[in-house]
Curated annotation (Swiss-Prot):
Protein name: Hydra actinoporin-like toxin 3
Subcellular localization, as worded in the UniProt entry: Nematocyst; Secreted; Target cell membrane
Protein origin, superkingdom: Eukaryota
Function: Pore-forming protein that forms hydrophilic pores and causes cytolysis. Compared to equinatoxin-2 (AC P61914), it reveals lower cytolysis activity (5-12-fold difference, tested on erythrocytes), a larger pore size (probably 2-3 nm) and different affinity to membrane lipids (100-fold lower affinity to sphingomyelin). Binds to the two sphingolipids, lysophosphatidic acid (LPA) and sphingosine-1-phosphate (S1P). Does not bind (or only weakly) to sulfatides (SFT).
Family according to the record: Belongs to the actinoporin family. HALT subfamily.
Signal peptide: 1-14
Gene Ontology biological process terms from the UniProt entry: cytolysis in another organism; monoatomic cation transport; pore complex assembly
Entry annotated with the keyword Transmembrane: yes
Subunit structure and binding partners: Octamer or nonamer in membranes. Monomer in the soluble state. In vitro, interacts with folate receptor alpha (of target organism).
SUPFAM superfamilies: Cytolysin/lectin
One Gene Ontology cellular component annotation held by this UniProt entry: extracellular region
Gene3D superfamilies xrefs: Cytolysin/lectin
Natural source organism: Hydra vulgaris
Keywords from the UniProt entry: Cytolysis, Hemolysis, Membrane, Nematocyst, Secreted, Signal, Target cell membrane, Target membrane, Toxin, Transmembrane
Amino acid sequence: LEATVSRNKKYKFTMGNVVRSWKCTVENKSNKTLYADGSTPVSGSMATVLTDIAPGGTGVFLWEQSKGAARGAVGVVYYRYEDKILSLMASIPYDWHLYNAWANARVSNKKESFSNLYNGYDGAQQPTIAGNWGEVDGTKFFLTDKSHAEFNVIFSG
């Protein structure tokens, strides 16, 4: 990336090898199958295929920032069961000096937006800051506070 600061001076900036991602492990401790139902990207995207999770099973997926972007890894992933949707949100910042990592979950009749989960709108609980356990609607979750975050979800239904 080059920028011209004045007519005669050019400066070159590099973003280095900064990478943001979150790996999510979903443990299904219920007697219901969790059917993969897509995602809503805010920054970055799924780097792996989202798969169904059988009762007693575990699913894993990876969300990465967009290549070369000075942005974090942020989005919502959805699982459907019966007439409900499990929405899982994680937000891993690009700049740890300005922002924190956050996570949230919600079981509802619709796919929850990132805004609702991040801000605690429309009946969603307030998000949980990384490094703390959150619990909502029979779902426990924990997000580590590092650039390559681990998002652990235990769904009990």
